[in-house]
Amino acid sequence: MPRRSIWKGSFVDAFLLRMKKKRDLLFNRKIWSRRSSILPEFVDCFVRIYNGKTFVRCKITEGKVGHKFGEFAFTRKRRPSRTNIGPGRKRGKK
């Protein structure tokens, strides 16, 4: 995926920029903007990121700075591969 131009800077929603100045408002805050970048001012805050159905709680650490909020709230369920079929079942059609 192409990266955003350096001269444009990282994208952050306007309401998150307002929260940047008041850190106490950001604790345990609901965030719908999955496309916004995580800024260094958000480190050590807990936020709840919307995944399309529920809000996923996430702690912002230094390693997450520069990434997008949506990278840490998965939108799809993980399903294990069905390699083992139980005894008594037959594979495929005859």
From Swiss-Prot:
The keyword NADP does not apply. Its main location: mitochondrion. Keywords: Mitochondrion, Ribonucleoprotein, Ribosomal protein. One of its GO terms (molecular function) is RNA binding. Belongs to the universal ribosomal protein uS19 family. GO terms for biological process: ribosomal small subunit assembly; translation. It is found in: Mitochondrion. InterPro entries: Ribosomal_uS19, Ribosomal_uS19_bac-type, Ribosomal_uS19_CS, Ribosomal_uS19_SF. This is Small ribosomal subunit protein uS19m. Gene3D superfamilies: 30s Ribosomal Protein S19, Chain A. GO terms for cellular component: mitochondrial small ribosomal subunit. The lineage of its organism: Eukaryota, Viridiplantae, Streptophyta, Embryophyta, Tracheophyta. It comes from Petunia hybrida (Petunia). HAMAP family: Ribosomal_uS19. It comes from the Eukaryota.
